[in-house]
Design a protein with these regions (language model features):
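Generic beta-strand structural signal
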Residues: 5, 123-124, 156
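Conserved polar/disulfide-associated segments of primarily extracytoplasmic proteins
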Residues: 24-117, 123, 128-129
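His/acidic/aromatic-lined binding-pocket segments of jelly-roll/cupin-type domains
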Residues: 12, 120-121
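Surface-exposed amphipathic alpha-helical segments
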Residues: 16-18, 129-157
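Generic detection of long, well-ordered alpha-helical segments
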Residues: 8, 67-71, 140-144
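Phosphate/oxyanion-binding loops and surfaces in catalytic or ligand/nucleic-acid-binding neighborhoods
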Residues: 21, 69, 157
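N-terminal "mature-domain start" segment
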Residues: 1-37
Length: 157
């Protein structure tokens, strides 16, 4: 199994069935091409996952102590997906790589497909690490189980 690095904070042993996305898939899924991000796909379940890391400015770092990073990401996702029938289902919290992660689950429509997404954010000082997944709603139960296996495989550096 392939060992991957997420930013400067986490590693991931790619679980069975997942593989890194190709450049063509990155373009198709509108994923940034950067050393600070990676994308994974599990074709059997049509799961697309992306992870990324960024450091924010000192000013934004101060705001992160006032505004929840997960709430900020949720506002951004809801704005970006407004034309796709975005609907938040619930807030989420869990550990990823031994760190507290806050997130949310939502639904949206992509073409004729009803989709489910989850996003998590880990804040550490001025660093933010993001974890996102997108999967068809008809595969929700098995897809979210695979997603949780992937998140369970994340380790802190």
């Amino acid at each position: 199994m392939e060992q991957l690095t997420i930013g400067k904070r986490f590693t991931l042993t790619c679980p069975e069935g997942f593989r890194p996305v190709t450049k063509e898939e990155r373009d198709r899924f509108h994923m940034p091409e950067s050393d600070d991000s990676l994308g994974l796909i599990r074709e059997d379940d049509r799961i697309v996952a992306s992870m990324g890391w960024k450091e924010v400015s000192a000013f934004a770092g101060v705001l992160l102590h006032v505004i929840s990073p997960a709430a900020s990401v949720e506002a951004s996702v809801s704005r970006d997906m407004a034309g796709y029938g975005y609907r938040k289902e619930k807030s989420l919290s869990r550990e990823i790589g031994g760190q507290k992660a806050e997130g949310f689950r939502y639904t949206y429509t992509a073409g004729d497909n009803f989709m489910v997404g989850e996003s998590y954010v880990i804040r550490s000082g001025r660093s933010l690490t993001f974890f996102h997944v997108y999967l068809p709603d008809e595969l929700r139960e098995q897809g979210l189980a695979r997603w949780n296996e992937l998140l369970d495989a994340v380790q802190s550096l």
